[in-house]
Amino acid sequence: MGAAASIQTTVNTLSERISSKLEQEANASAQTKCDIEIGNFYIRQNHGCNLTVKNMCSADADAQLDAVLSAATETYSGLTPEQKAYVPAMFTAALNIQTSVNTVVRDFENYVKQTCNSSAVVDNKLKIQNVIIDECYGAPGSPTNLEFINTGSSKGNCAIKALMQLTTKATTQIAPRQVAGTGVQFYMIVIGVIILAALFMYYAKRMLFTSTNDKIKLILANKENVHWTTYMDTFFRTSPMVIATTDIQN
């Protein structure tokens, strides 16, 4: 679902819409006595996630289910194309559902209605229920804050749990990539600094610390290359002195 920061934004938006839909469509309220309480919430592998439980209970379990699905649909519709592209993989990993960007809403609705209307869920009369999530990751430098909304019914809580499984699965896919990406960027920066430092030292040595052999080479390289005809010109530039034989005899 895009960057890890977008996950937190999506979580917040989803929670707000669920609360609003439950209030509007299922007459839920934070003051209503809940028939079911959340006893414990387990995250088997928690890597930086915080959790709070919020009660929004009512007596209409079917309306709760519809409200949760409506909130999920609206939230998905508000995602960017890049974020939507992540969702099918999240469905497969979290709920074992094969889906696509175009059918994800319908497939999720079918999954929730089949699962949450099953006898195993409907006949669960436990007044205190526990919720178990496999794993959750926080974004680099900041935790992911989750909110489980207790609807007060097994049906409603079943739908909420399905959404939370998707959300936490998204954190396991995005946050580790960001950590890995941060590490790669760090090493690339370090390597770049080392290369620049090596180049600086090389040129500094050439400029400030020149050996005797290098100095000789530089002098010879800068010395003018004199052509052989120049030496002949120099030799014949002054007329030779003529000595008479009489002078020698005397």
UniProtKB/Swiss-Prot annotation:
Myristoylated. Disulfid bonds are oxidized in the cytoplasm by OPG088 protein. GO terms for cellular component: membrane; viral envelope; virion membrane. The lineage of its organism: Viruses, Varidnaviria, Bamfordvirae, Nucleocytoviricota, Pokkesviricetes. Residues 205-250 are intravirion. The chain crosses the membrane at residues 184-204. One of its GO terms (biological process) is virion attachment to host cell. It is a single-pass membrane protein. Residues 2-183 are virion surface. It is found in: Virion membrane. This is Entry-fusion complex associated protein OPG095. Pfam families: L1R_F9L (PF02442). InterPro entries: Virion_mem_poxvirus_L1. Disulfide bonds join 34-57, 49-136, 116-158. The keyword Glycosyltransferase does not apply. Component of the entry fusion complex (EFC) composed of OPG053, OPG076, OPG086, OPG094, OPG095, OPG099, OPG107, OPG143, OPG104, OPG147 and OPG155. Except for OPG095 and OPG053, each of the EFC proteins is required for assembly or stability of the complex. Belongs to the orthopoxvirus OPG095 family. Induction: Expressed in the late phase of the viral replicative cycle. It comes from Variola virus (isolate Human/India/Ind3/1967) (VARV). Residues 2-12 are annotated as: Targeting to MV membrane.
